[in-house]
Regions:
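Long, hydrophobic, amphipathic alpha-helical segments used as structural scaffolds
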Residues: 33, 123-127, 157-161
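A short mid-domain helix/strand-loop element embedded in enzyme catalytic domains
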Residues: 87-92, 118-127
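Post-HEXXH active-site segment of zinc metalloproteases
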Residues: 96-97, 106-110, 125-152
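Short alpha-helix carrying the canonical HExxH Zn2+-binding catalytic motif
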Residues: 106-120
Length: 181
C-alpha cells in the first residue's frame, strides 16, 4: 500500500461522527471540570483532521499529536493578549486502521476516547497542571495519568462500543506526541 492510499482523510460521514464525539467530550469535560461555555474560550485549541494538517503535523505512529503555537492562525491577538494555542492533530488514517484491525472497535467510541484524552491534556496544560515542554519520562507519567483520567471519566457512560474501546486501550501508554511549533 502506498503512503498516499494509507493516509486518506476522513470522509463526510466520518467527520460527522467526529463532530459528535467532540460535542459529547466537551460536554462531559464541562461537567467534570466545571467549565462554563464562556470559560471554554480561554482553552485555546482546535481539533483538526488529516485534510487540514500541515505535513509536519502528520504521523503514522499515534492517534493524535498536539502542537503548541503562540496563536491560532485564525486569531488576531493584541499585544497584551498572550497564551498558548493547542492544535490537536487527529491522524485519520491511524484511527481508521485501528477500526479496521479490530471488529469490536467502532469509530464513534474510539474518537470519543481520543478527543476526551486530548482535551484533558489541553485542560491540564492550560491550568498549568502539566508542563507542555517536559522530558520523555515526564511525558510518559503524564500519559498514564491522562489515560487514567480519561478511563475514569468515560467508564460509566452508556455509549455502545465504549466498553470495548476502554478494554482495548486500558494498558495503552501512548496516545499522542507533543510538539512546540
Amino acid at each position: 500500500m502506498t503512503e498516499h492510499t494509507e493516509r486518506l482523510p476522513f470522509q463526510q460521514g466520518e467527520i460527522a461522527v467526529l463532530r459528535q464525539s467532540i460535542d459529547i467530550s466537551e460536554e462531559l469535560l464541562s461537567e467534570h471540570y466545571k467549565i462554563s461555555t464562556s470559560q471554554w474560550k480561554r482553552y485555546r485549541y482546535d481539533i483538526q483532521s488529516l485534510k487540514d494538517l500541515q505535513t509536519k503535523e502528520i504521523t503514522d505512529l499515534a492517534f493524535a499529536q498536539i502542537y503548541r503555537y503562540a496563536q491560532s492562525p485564525h486569531e488576531r491577538l493584541r499585544g497584551s493578549e498572550t497564551g498558548d494555542y493547542f492544535k490537536i492533530c487527529l491522524q485519520d488514517h491511524v484511527v481508521r486502521r485501528a477500526v479496521k484491525r479490530d471488529a469490536t472497535i467502532q469509530l464513534f467510541p474510539l474518537s470519543l476516547y481520543i478527543v476526551t484524552h486530548e482535551l484533558i491534556h489541553v485542560i491540564r496544560f492550560a491550568k498549568f497542571l502539566q508542563r507542555f515542554d517536559s522530558t520523555a519520562a515526564e511525558q510518559e507519567v503524564e500519559e498514564g495519568r491522562v489515560h487514567a483520567l480519561t478511563f475514569k471519566l468515560l467508564e460509566n457512560c452508556k455509549i455502545p462500543g465504549l466498553p470495548e474501546v476502554l478494554s482495548a486501550f486500558k494498558d495503552c501508554r501512548t496516545m499522542e506526541t507533543f510538539f512546540p511549533a
